[in-house]
Amino acid sequence: MTGISLALNPRQVFGNKNKFLRAQGITPVHIFGHGLKSLALQANTQELESTISRAGSSHLVSLKLDTDKKTRKAFIREIQRHPVKGYLQHVDFYQINLKEKVTAEIPIHFSGESPLLKEKGHKLTAPFTHLTVEALPDDLPPEIHIELSQFDSPEKDLYIKDIVLPGNARILNEPDLLVAKVSEIHLKVETPVTASLPEEPEEKPAAAAEEKETAEKE
C-alpha cells in the first residue's frame, strides 16, 4: 500500500455550528497526542472517507496542515457517525512520535494457493483476522502476509512463533497460538431412524369378561 496522506485546514467553527460545515462537505477533525496540544481542524469529507477506508486503525496517515511546513504522522483513533444516517460527524487522529514504538492491530492477508485446498474435502482454519504488533511507526507492516502454498500436508500448522516480521516489528500475541492450518473435512453420516409402528393396546380384563358373559347368554 502506498503512503496515505490527508490535507487539513484550521477550524474556526465549533459546537452546534459544525452542522453547517457538514452541510458543505466538510468534517470536523481533532489531532491530539502525547505532549501535544489538541488541534481543532477540518477536512474534506470525501477525502476523509477515502482515508478511513484505506487506513483503518492500523495504518499511519500523513497529515498535511496548510499552516505547517512539517507532515504529522498519526493513526485514526476515533470515528463518530450519525447513529441513524451514518454520515461522518467527527474524526480524531492520534499523532505519534516516530522515535517511539507503537502498538497496532495489523490485518492478516492470505495469498497463493494450497495444494490441499484445491482438493475437495479440505478447509482452511484461521482463528485470527488481526494480530497485535509492536514496532517503530515507520516499521509497522501494512499487513501480515501468509503464503498458502506452504500448506501442502494436513500436518502443517502455522503458529505465531513461526511468523517473521521485517525490521524490529514483533508480534505481541502468545507465540503458541495457532494462526492457520488446513485440515480434512469429516462428514458425519447419520443413521436413518426407522419409524416403529405403535403397539395395539392390550384388551382390558373387564371388557374381555363382559364379552365372554354376553357370548354365554347367547
Swiss-Prot record:
One of the Pfam families matching this protein, by short name: Ribosomal_L25p
Region Disordered, annotated ranges: 191-218
InterPro entries xrefs: Rbsml_bL25/Gln-tRNA_synth_N (IPR020056), Ribosomal_bL25/Gln-tRNA_synth (IPR011035), Ribosomal_bL25_b-dom (IPR020057), Ribosomal_bL25_C (IPR037121), Ribosomal_bL25_long (IPR001021), Ribosomal_L25_dom (IPR029751), Ribosomal_uL5_bac-type (IPR020930)
Molecular-function annotations in GO: 5S rRNA binding; structural constituent of ribosome
Alphabetic keyword roster: Ribonucleoprotein, Ribosomal protein, RNA-binding, rRNA-binding
Organism superkingdom: Bacteria
Main function: This is one of the proteins that binds to the 5S RNA in the ribosome where it forms part of the central protuberance.
PANTHER family, A to Z: RIBOSOMAL PROTEIN L25/GLN-TRNA SYNTHETASE, ANTI-CODON-BINDING DOMAIN-CONTAINING PROTEIN (PTHR33284), RIBOSOMAL PROTEIN L25_GLN-TRNA SYNTHETASE, ANTI-CODON-BINDING DOMAIN-CONTAINING PROTEIN (PTHR33284:SF1)
HAMAP family in UniProt: Ribosomal_bL25_CTC (MF_01334)
Protein name: Large ribosomal subunit protein bL25
Upper classification of the organism: Bacteria, Bacillati, Chloroflexota, Dehalococcoidia, Dehalococcoidales
Gene: rplY
